[in-house]
Amino acid sequence: MALREIIILPDKRLREISKPVAEVTPEIRKLADDMFESMYDAPGIGLAAIQIAEPVRLITMDIVRKEGNGKSDPRAFINPEIVGASAEMNVYEEGCLSIPEYYADVERPAVVRIRYTDLDGNVKEEDADGLFATCIQHEIDHLDGVLFVDHLSKLKRAMVVRKFEKAAKRGIKYV
């Protein structure tokens, strides 16, 4: 495993649309391992491969760790897609490792049905709700070049982007 640098807004690579993974290879498994290590180090509960400058449709998540009970449930999702969503919506305060120290309420479907491939090459479908639903939607957005701030008003989004552009010009590094 290797710790990888997480790219930060305004890095243009965050807007790239990630390419599908053709097959689960040892390289994809190694990338997932690197992503888990980088995600835990940050610390975070979800990471899309594009956030470490790898434009492939791979997500790692461990929402159990957020609860701080010492437990862990690391999961990897290859080529994840939302195949159904509830009409009911939830609002959750979101943050992002690529937009450090900024949090905002985002409204998303309360329940989504996802289809993905696991690290063993098995295609699976399952329903996600609560934090799992919010996190998987947030990470799938990354794979499509969408950031959580894109769900905010135009004014709020512009303020956040401007803040990070100024920080980048000044050479401010978020750690």
Swiss-Prot record:
EC number of the protein: 3.5.1.88
Bilayer-spanning residue ranges: none
Cofactors: Fe(2+)
Cofactor note: Binds 1 Fe(2+) ion.
Residues reported in the UniProt entry to bind Fe cation: C96, H138, H142
GO BP field: co-translational protein modification; translation
Stored Pfam families: Pep_deformylase
An example molecular function term from Gene Ontology annotations: metal ion binding
Catalytic activity reported: N-terminal N-formyl-L-methionyl-[peptide] + H2O = N-terminal L-methionyl-[peptide] + formate
Domain of life per record: Bacteria
Cited function: Removes the formyl group from the N-terminal Met of newly synthesized proteins. Requires at least a dipeptide for an efficient rate of reaction. N-terminal L-methionine is a prerequisite for activity but the enzyme has broad specificity at other positions.
Family membership noted in the UniProt record: Belongs to the polypeptide deformylase family.
Protein name: Peptide deformylase
Organism of this sequence: Rhodopseudomonas palustris (strain BisB5)
